[in-house]
Amino acid sequence: MFRIGQGFDVHQLVEGRPLIIGGVTIPYEKGLLGHSDADVLLHAVADACLGAIGAGDIGRHFPDTDPRFKDADSAELLAHVWALARQEGYRLVNADCTIIAQKPKLAPYIEEMRAVIARLLEAERSQVNVKATTTEKLGFTGRGEGIAAQAVVLLQKS
């Protein structure tokens, strides 16, 4: 049996926080605001995985009202989500992810993001695609107010 999941996340860019996307710390004058480390890409991947297995969303599993998740490492959150999928007998067929950001340029970090996500999902790098795009200066991402990410995963039950 195959299951598809889709995830989407947005975080505001603010001064005084590190910018972590796809498990990679990116040098930039702003970072993403959130209860956890606000890794918009790993949050989208986690939501996609939860959607594929019919287990709700990351807000249900890691509520921002719970102090245990304050400044949490999103890689650990995704690892927990993936453990739930594995317990249900799923493996990753592929993941396709898009980061929407006007700045900074993310191309130099894409391969490292792919490697991080592949490791967390116990997959080969070839099973994970990450791409980045802009909105041609339109909307909140185009104005540099925030960054968004989308992810789609295809899982297969063993």
UniProtKB/Swiss-Prot annotation:
InterPro entries: MECDP_synthase, MECDP_synthase_CS, MECDP_synthase_sf. CDD domains: MECDP_synthase. Binds 1 divalent metal cation per subunit. Keywords: Isoprene biosynthesis, Lyase, Metal-binding. Its EC number is 4.6.1.12. It catalyses: 4-CDP-2-C-methyl-D-erythritol 2-phosphate = 2-C-methyl-D-erythritol 2,4-cyclic diphosphate + CMP. It is an enzyme of class 4 (lyase). Pfam families: YgbB. A divalent metal cation binds at D9, H11, H43. Pathway: Isoprenoid biosynthesis; isopentenyl diphosphate biosynthesis via DXP pathway; isopentenyl diphosphate from 1-deoxy-D-xylulose 5-phosphate: step 4/6. 4-CDP-2-C-methyl-D-erythritol 2-phosphate binds at residues 9-11, 35-36, 57-59, 62-66, 133-136, 140, 143. It comes from the Bacteria. GO terms for biological process: isopentenyl diphosphate biosynthetic process, methylerythritol 4-phosphate pathway; terpenoid biosynthetic process. GO terms for molecular function: 2-C-methyl-D-erythritol 2,4-cyclodiphosphate synthase activity; metal ion binding. The keyword Metal-binding applies. Its cofactor is a divalent metal cation. The record marks H35, T134 as: Transition state stabilizer. Belongs to the IspF family. Homotrimer. Involved in the biosynthesis of isopentenyl diphosphate (IPP) and dimethylallyl diphosphate (DMAPP), two major building blocks of isoprenoid compounds. Catalyzes the conversion of 4-diphosphocytidyl-2-C-methyl-D-erythritol 2-phosphate (CDP-ME2P) to 2-C-methyl-D-erythritol 2,4-cyclodiphosphate (ME-CPP) with a corresponding release of cytidine 5-monophosphate (CMP). This is 2-C-methyl-D-erythritol 2,4-cyclodiphosphate synthase. The lineage of its organism: Bacteria, Bacillati, Bacillota, Bacilli, Bacillales. The gene is ispF.
